[in-house]
């Protein structure tokens, strides 16, 4: 059909739409006008029955921008135009419905048909091999989904199916756009059953897919897009917040600057307390400054402003009595907002009415001002030491001497609050200013009285001991006071037991007297018997007194001791209290045991009996105290190493843990002086103990402490045993330990630090790495071929990953404090040679391929040892000739061989050049010497003789060349492949021939320095520098 001008309407529609697209790609400025024109064109086309033509040409023109790259601004402008056009049509329909405008079915149908056909048309490119087309298609779908309300169910299913595929596209840019599309299909109600969905469920859920992307996608940008667009509710929030441990810096920072900031006050109520503490700790301790600053800004500005600047309320939300990160959080707040400090005051009336938050704030502000030398705040807000001791004593009396509280639950709550307040005041008191002697004595009295309380909690015991140490005149004074407190507690308990026994005996006597009064007629006989016994006792007493008076007493001292009543012992609970105080005291003592007799007496009376005690808790505390004493005296450590080893071998889990800690500490302090000697424990026995602990995966905590301790001892070169070190590395890669995250984390940090800290450490790794690799290859093969269904085949790393890790650890370029000799280091070459030596022992072709394909990660340099490079080349040639390799392995091995050949040629050329330079230098020196020694005629004679000698040398050289040519001919005739052993035999024979030739030349050189005789006035000159000295001696 044509218009009155004779132009085809279909063509006119194309020209009109094309003109709009042409103008729209130039700038965003006229898009509103272009959208109005497009709407007018569409309405006219529909009126004239050309709806399909408009849709066709619209689709056709949009298709033109699909191959454009991501950075092409023209494509982005057309995409914005399409999104704005569809949004405008949708907006008109919504506005008409709100104004109760009666829409015809045709008006709604036009819009729905246009959107339906356009999305279906665009989806045809979602499987395109061109990454740009896939990107533009999903970009269009993402902006369209933002601007439409409802779509057909069949179209919805088609979209979900397509997006489900594109979320795993190989291009990150495409996956990001797929994430943007999926976020439009999230259903908040579906997240309630997020964890109950199965992977094979046909009804695909967008939220579950986004959760999978946020956890597993390798691209940081894709994870970021999923994190920022995932619904934030109780079910999805843990997956969002775990991005605080993302490997990408930006993702970690956005958790604090976007996610938590957008939650506002909901953070304190919607996030679980332990997760909340972890987020603060991770943010403030992040290795990147930008992440730390984002976390500080969140605490000091966003959260504080959300709470209207109420610092006390912020501390309440942080739950200072429970949380362990509040100290770091409040320090970050003071650093970011120093203006807050000047606004905080502690009036006199508040000191007797501390709350948990105020007590914590007092401690935090005092320590912050002390660390940062803010003396004005210290002088204005904080009392003198004597006043502080009064306040501390006030709360101690409230906690331990207040018995008027009737409500048990309220009493429990008050007790915890008071203990926390006492702890905060004590922490501040440890570093308080005690220049006033009155204040020091007052605080010391309060602290000693507090430590004498038997009901004191362990945290208060610990801080109380530390405060007493800071108040002591010297360490001897501190030990004296601490042991006095321990002895007083024990003596009080024994005295209390004696009093209780006296009371019991008095009650028994009263009962006996009552029973005597109520006796019947048989009582007369009993009275007679009692009278006889009393008479016997009186007579024996008189005889004993008489013997003593007359000096006839024959009673021995042993009899007296045996007749003494047994010594009372403190109760188990009291022993635990004493051991707890002594352990915290010993942690602060540095004086050798030989100079402190009080600790030696404490060993005899408290610690040694505790180690022999059968109660587990007492024995564990006794071993801990014994270990702390061993750190003060090497002889004591030597004497008790066997006991500590037995505790590790035979004790329960907690005793093993403590004993392992003690053994590691003893080695750290005293080194190897405690083993391998007369009366000492054998070091091999201790190594076996560590070996057994590392192999026992039933005690993961003990594995961790053994691994960390061994790594420290190896790092300090206290332990140097290769077998034990090999056990450490094998434990790291063992699949049995893959679930022990603490152990794997300890190894992942300690092993690289050890290898890169010193060349000797890297050499130890190189010596053991080949055997480690072989063992792990065998283990991996057994794991993969296992028929047991419970075996997790993914629990162990593949051999190629392990090989890469070992190469990385033995790379000399990774050493700290590198010197110029790093390029000459052959430690990695030695490891690779060892690997090629054991290559034949590996039976699995798959494992061989894994090793060969990663062999080129080795560091090669022309400055490395020539013989080592030559040996590596020989083993590589041997494998290439005798092993049946696939193309990939062959190419990798050929690359290594080519690199080695080029390096060897370079070394040879450099050696030849250096030899020539040395010869030239030597000739110049000899010429100057000869010129000074002989006249011109003698020099002419010498030159003539030198020519003759050169001719002889030329003949000798030709002979050598002929010999080598014959050898080459022989080698070519025997063209079969030689084994490694045959090649070594041939090399040996060649070396013998060369030696004989060299011997001949040596004889010639030795004879060369002879003065000319009568028959010949010629004399040859040797090339060695040292021969000039011989010549001068002869002259």
UniProtKB/Swiss-Prot annotation:
Keyword Nucleus: yes
Stretch forming the signal peptide: none
Keywords assigned by UniProt, alphabetized: Cell cycle, Cell division, Chromosome, Cytoplasm, DNA condensation, Mitosis, Nucleus, Phosphoprotein, Repeat
Any further remark recorded for this protein: Present with 1920 molecules/cell in log phase SD medium.
Region (Disordered), start-end ranges: 500-536, 909-934, 959-995, 1012-1035
Subunit structure: Component of the condensin complex, which contains the SMC2 and SMC4 heterodimer, and three non SMC subunits that probably regulate the complex: BRN1, YCS4 and YCG1/YCS5.
Job of this protein: Regulatory subunit of the condensin complex, a complex required for conversion of interphase chromatin into mitotic-like condense chromosomes. The condensin complex probably introduces positive supercoils into relaxed DNA in the presence of type I topoisomerases and converts nicked DNA into positive knotted forms in the presence of type II topoisomerases. The condensin complex probably also plays a role during interphase.
Ranges of compositional bias, category Basic and acidic residues: 909-919
Glycoprotein recorded as keyword: no
Recorded superkingdom: Eukaryota
Family assignment from sequence similarity: Belongs to the CND3 (condensin subunit 3) family.
Annotated HEAT repeat ranges: 113-150, 153-191, 201-239, 597-635, 827-864
Residue list for modification Phosphoserine: 198, 933, 981, 1008
Molecular function GO terms recorded: chromatin binding
Protein name: Condensin complex subunit 3
Gene Ontology biological-process entries: cell division; chromosome condensation; meiotic chromosome condensation; meiotic chromosome separation; mitotic chromosome condensation; mitotic sister chromatid segregation; negative regulation of meiotic DNA double-strand break formation; rDNA chromatin condensation
Polar residues bias (residue ranges): 920-934, 959-973, 986-995
Gene Ontology cellular-component annotations: condensed chromosome; condensin complex; cytoplasm; nucleus
Subcellular location: Nucleus; Cytoplasm; Chromosome
InterPro entries listed in its UniProt record: ARM-like, ARM-type_fold, CND3, Cnd3_C
């Amino acid at each position: 059909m044509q218009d009155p001008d004779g132009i085809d309407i279909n063509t006119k529609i194309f020209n009109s739409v094309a003109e709009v697209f042409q103008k729209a790609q130039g700038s965003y400025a006229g898009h509103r006008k272009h959208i109005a024109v497009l709407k007018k064109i569409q309405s006219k086309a529909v009126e004239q029955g050309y709806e399909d033509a408009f849709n066709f040409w619209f689709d056709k023109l949009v298709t033109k921008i699909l191959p454009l790259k991501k950075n092409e601004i023209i494509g982005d402008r057309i995409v914005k135009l399409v999104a704005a056009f569809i949004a405008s049509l949708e907006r008109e329909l919504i506005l008409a419905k709100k104004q109760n405008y009666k829409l015809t079915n045709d008006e709604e149908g036009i819009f729905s048909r246009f959107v339906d056909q356009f999305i279906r048309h665009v989806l045809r490119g979602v499987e395109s091999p061109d990454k740009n087309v896939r990107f533009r298609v999903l970009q269009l779908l993402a902006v369209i989904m933002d601007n439409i309300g409802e779509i057909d169910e069949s179209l919805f299913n088609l979209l979900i199916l397509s997006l489900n595929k594109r979320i795993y596209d190989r291009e990150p840019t495409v996956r990001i756009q797929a994430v943007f599309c999926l976020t439009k299909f999230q259903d908040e109600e579906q997240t309630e059953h997020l964890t109950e969905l199965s992977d094979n469920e046909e009804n695909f859920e967008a939220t579950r897919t986004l959760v999978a992307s946020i956890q597993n996608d390798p691209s940081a940008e894709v994870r970021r897009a999923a994190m920022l667009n995932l619904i934030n509710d109780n079910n999805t929030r843990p997956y969002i917040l775990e991005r605080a441990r993302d490997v990408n810096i930006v993702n970690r920072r956005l958790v604090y600057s976007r996610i938590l900031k957008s939650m506002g006050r909901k953070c304190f109520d919607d996030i679980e307390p332990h997760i909340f503490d972890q987020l603060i700790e991770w943010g403030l301790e992040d290795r990147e400054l930008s992440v730390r600053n984002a976390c500080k800004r969140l605490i000091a500005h966003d959260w504080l402003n959300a709470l209207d600047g109420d610092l006390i309320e912020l501390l309440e939300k942080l739950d200072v009595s429970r949380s362990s990160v509040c100290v770091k959080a409040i320090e970050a707040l003071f650093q970011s907002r120093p203006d807050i400090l000047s606004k905080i005051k502690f009036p006199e009336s508040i000191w007797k009415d501390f709350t948990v938050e105020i007590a914590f704030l007092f401690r935090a502000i005092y320590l912050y001002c002390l660390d940062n030398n803010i003396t004005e705040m210290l002088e204005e807000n904080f009392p003198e030491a004597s006043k502080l001791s009064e306040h501390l004593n006030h709360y101690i009396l409230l906690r331990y001497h207040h018995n008027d509280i009737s409500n048990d639950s309220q009493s429990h709550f008050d007790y915890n609050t008071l203990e926390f307040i006492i702890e905060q005041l004590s922490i501040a008191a440890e570093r308080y200013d005690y220049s006033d002697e009155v204040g020091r004595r007052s605080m010391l009295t309060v602290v000693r009285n507090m430590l004498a309380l038997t009901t004191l909690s362990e945290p208060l015991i610990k801080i109380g001991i530390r405060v007493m140490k800071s108040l002591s005149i010297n360490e001897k004074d501190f030990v004296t006071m601490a042991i006095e407190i321990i002895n007083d507690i024990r003596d009080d308990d024994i005295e209390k037991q004696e009093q209780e026994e006296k009371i019991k005996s008095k009650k028994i006597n009263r009962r006996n007297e009552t029973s005597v009064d109520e006796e019947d007629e048989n009582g007369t006989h009993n009275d007679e018997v009692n009278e006889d016994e009393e008479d016997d006792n009186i007579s024996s007493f008189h005889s004993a007194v008489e013997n003593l008076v007359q000096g006839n007493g024959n009673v021995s001292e042993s009899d007296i001791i045996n007749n003494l009543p047994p010594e009372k012992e403190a109760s188990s609970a009291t022993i635990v209290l004493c051991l707890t105080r002594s352990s915290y005291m010993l942690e602060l003592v540095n004086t050798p045991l030989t100079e402190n007799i009080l600790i030696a007496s404490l060993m005899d009376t408290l610690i040694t009996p505790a180690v022999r005690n059968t109660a587990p808790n007492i024995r564990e505390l006794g071993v801990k105290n014994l270990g702390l004493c061993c750190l003060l005296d090497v002889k004591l450590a030597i004497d008790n190493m066997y006991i500590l080893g037995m505790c590790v071998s035979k004790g329960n889990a907690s005793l093993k843990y403590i004993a392992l800690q003690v053994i590691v500490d003893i080695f750290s302090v005293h080194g190897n002086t405690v083993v391998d000697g007369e009366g000492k424990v054998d070091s091999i026995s201790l190594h076996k103990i560590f070996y057994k602990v590392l192999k026992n995966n039933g005690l993961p905590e003990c594995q961790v402490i053994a691994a960390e301790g061994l790594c420290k001892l190896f790092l300090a070169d206290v332990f140097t045993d290769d077998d034990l070190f090999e056990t450490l590395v094998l434990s790291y890669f063992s699949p049995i330990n893959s679930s022990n995250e603490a152990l794997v984390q300890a190894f992942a940090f300690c092993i690289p630090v050890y290898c890169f800290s010193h060349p000797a450490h890297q050499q130890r790794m190189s010596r053991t790495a080949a055997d480690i690799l072989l063992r792990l290859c065998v283990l991996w093969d057994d794991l993969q071929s296992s028929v047991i269904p419970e075996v997790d085949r993914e629990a162990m790393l593949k051999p190629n990953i392990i090989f890469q890790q070992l190469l990385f650890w033995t790379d000399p370029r990774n050493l700290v404090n590198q010197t110029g000799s790093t390029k000459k280091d052959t430690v990695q070459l030695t490891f690779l040679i060892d690997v090629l030596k054991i290559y034949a022992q590996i039976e699995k072709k798959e494992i061989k391929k894994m090793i060969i394909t990663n062999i080129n990660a080795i560091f090669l340099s022309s400055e490395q040892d020539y013989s080592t490079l030559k040996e590596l080349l020989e083993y590589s040639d041997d494998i290439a000739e005798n092993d049946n390799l696939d193309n990939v392995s062959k190419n990798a091995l050929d690359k290594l061989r080519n690199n080695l050949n080029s390096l060897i040629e370079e070394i040879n050329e450099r050696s030849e050049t250096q030899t020539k330079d040395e010869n030239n230098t030597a000739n110049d020196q000899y010429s100057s010497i000869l010129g000074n020694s002989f006249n011109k005629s003698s020099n002419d004679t010498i030159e003539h003789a030198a020519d003759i000698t050169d001719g002889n040398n030329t003949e000798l050289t030709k002979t050598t060349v002929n010999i080598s040519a014959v050898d080459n001919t022989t080698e070519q005739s025997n063209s079969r492949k030689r084994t490694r052993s045959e090649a070594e035999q041939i090399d040996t024979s060649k070396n013998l021939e060369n030696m004989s030739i060299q011997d001949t030349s040596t004889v010639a050189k030795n004879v060369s320095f002879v003065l000319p005789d009568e028959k010949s006035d010629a004399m040859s000159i040797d090339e060695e520098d040292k021969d000039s000295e011989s010549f001068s001696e002869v002259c």
